[in-house]
């Protein structure tokens, strides 16, 4: 797997050192690419000790190479893009380019994506009922007379 991005992205997150903590994992492109491939998503649960210790993720992360691509560096900091190329054992090659990261100024989350992210981040701490209640209060904040429950 080859991930090409802007220079600062390579310097900040392109280290081949395998993460040992959730914080290190969040700043490791090889880890995040591998975890997304293995688990089919990249959510908060991929940044746990259990996921970091997953041998399938570790093995795949060792095969991720992060490189600078001049056209992404030229667009940075206005655009935070990258492209990924995956070469499969059967010879198939898959590529995908993203001009702007999901959730960025130029590629904002949809309303549904923002709600899903909120639930993913809050449910482990708040539980489903409190999380839904809090999200509803936030979505209707202009109608609240006070914010004590938030």
What kind of feature is each model-predicted range?
Residues 2-150:
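Terminal-appendage/accessory-domain detector
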């Amino acid at each position: 797997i080859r991930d090409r991005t802007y220079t600062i992205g390579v310097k900040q997150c392109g280290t081949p050192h395998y993460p040992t903590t959730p914080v290190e994992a969040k700043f490791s492109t090889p880890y995040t690419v591998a975890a997304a491939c293995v688990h089919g998503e990249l959510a908060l649960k991929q940044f746990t000790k259990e996921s970091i210790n997953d041998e399938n993720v570790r093995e795949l992360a060792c095969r991720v190479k992060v490189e600078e691509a001049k056209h992404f560096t030229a667009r940075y900091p206005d655009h935070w893009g990258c492209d990924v190329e995956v070469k499969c054992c059967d010879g198939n090659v898959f590529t995908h380019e993203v001009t702007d990261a999901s959730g960025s100024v130029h590629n904002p989350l949809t309303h549904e994506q923002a709600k899903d992210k909120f639930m993913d981040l809050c449910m482990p701490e708040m539980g489903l009922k409190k999380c839904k209640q809090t999200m509803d209060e936030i979505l209707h904040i202009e109608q609240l007379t006070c914010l004590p429950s938030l």
